[in-house]
From Swiss-Prot:
Belongs to the ATPase protein 8 family. This is ATP synthase F(0) complex subunit 8. The modification N6-succinyllysine is found at residue 54. It comes from the Eukaryota. Pfam families: ATP-synt_8. Its main location: mitochondrion. It is found in: Mitochondrion membrane. GO terms for molecular function: proton transmembrane transporter activity.
Amino acid sequence: MPQLDTSTWFITITSMIMTLFILFQLKISNYSYPASPESIELKTQKHSTPWEMKWTKIYLPLLLPPR
């Protein structure tokens, strides 16, 4: 059975890691980040739900004083 030649593994793995690093750096460099995220105000939207339109009273019989 022939012996496995591992002499080229180091250069192959090293070049693969370097290539992946460069590709990820190029991918990340295309994103544009805001200069100061604290200065941006987010507008909150009020969602209308059907139970907000109605007046409801919750009775808690266990908390009512005895008559």
